[in-house]
Amino acid sequence: MSFNAEWSIEEHKTAGGRSHFAEFVAGLTDAKDIKDAAALIGVLRALGNQLREPRSKSLEDGLFELRGTQVRIYYGFLPGRRVVLVGGYVKKRTDTPRDVLRLMRGRLKEVRDEYQKSRVGTAGTKGR
């Protein structure tokens, strides 16, 4: 086993296949923000749960905020060195609006619920 294994980066998708993170990135217009987002994902892939402040901030309920100059990327972890991106935000003021954080927490809850359903669905099929 390699101790330098990269983390798997995944995007949360809705039941309809929509990726809020991909939409966030597609909506970035400032070249600095685009470059910042790409660099942040690279650091996250390399360091995963070893990231600390000021680059990554643990919010509540397992939600994390990856912090660039203005770009914020929201994510959580799943077993197996998996990172799930749930969305992003370009910071325009000193504090992130509560509705943005509430939305990101809701998306992460969806991710965890889907993961639990998949575990329950496969638990009964082992050994068959």
Language-model features: locations:
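Basic, Lys/Arg-enriched alpha-helical interface segments
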Residues: 1-70, 79-83, 90-128
